[in-house]
Regions:
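Acidic, turn/loop-rich segments in luminal/extracellular domains of secretory-pathway
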Residues: 1-52, 62-141, 148-203
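Short structured motifs
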Residues: 56-58, 145-146
Length: 203
């Protein structure tokens, strides 16, 4: 018998199992009996401490496209050791840790799921958890490609093919305005007709 440890005897084999994460000293009393009389002896059992690796819980988070996600990390170490943290992203982003503050930066214009592995270390052992980060889409404004200054002669029209890019893959429509010239857009074709006898510069 003893205090909190689990003790079993099988024939002449004594097995002692201390509680999880226990360390310290305890007395064990062994009794032998012949069915009529019994004798007891005690001995002291010392359980030496060993390092227990920290743990990090799995968590989930949400952020918008092109917006950093910031989280205060919280690991558990039953030994009370000071923890340091590291983080890595499987793809489509990057992660950095300052103290216990995690910052996850999705790649530009990315939306979808990021998996971030967070590791806590106590200097002797480590444990990891997974942050599942959902990056929600936002609309990105389209851009016009290859539009440069143009020169034409008086009393002539200018026709240009205009091109745009939308990273979201949305269908694009074009329009154009200026001062006194007549402007029309047909699909991706821009036609500019200055007034008769006009010369000069137009924006």
């Amino acid at each position: 018998t003893n205090g909190d440890s689990d003790i079993s005897v099988d024939g002449t084999t004594l097995t002692i199992t201390p509680p999880a994460n226990y360390n310290g000293s305890e007395d064990v009393t062994v009794t032998v009996s012949d069915g009529v009389l019994e004798t007891s002896e005690s001995f002291n059992l010392t359980v030496n401490p060993v390092n227990d690796a920290p743990t990090v819980q799995d968590v989930a988070g949400t952020t918008a496209e092109d917006v950093d996600f910031v989280l205060e990390l919280d690991g558990t170490d039953i030994d009370g050791d000071e923890l340091t943290f590291l983080a890595s992203v499987s793809a489509n982003g990057s992660a950095s840790v300052s103290g216990s503050t995690l910052t996850v930066t999705p790649d530009a214009d990315y939306n979808g799921t990021l998996e971030v592995t967070v590791t806590a270390s106590d200097g002797q052992g480590s444990g990891s958890g997974l942050l599942t980060l959902e990056v929600t889409p936002v609309n990105d404004a389209p851009v016009i490609l290859g539009l440069e200054d143009q020169t034409i002669d008086e009393d002539t029209s200018l026709t240009l093919d205009i091109n745009g890019l939308d990273v979201d893959g949305d269908a694009l429509t074009f329009s154009a305005t200026n001062g006194d010239s007549d402007i029309s857009v047909d699909g991706t074709t821009l036609t500019i007709t200055p007034p008769a006898n006009y010369n000069g510069s137009d924006d």
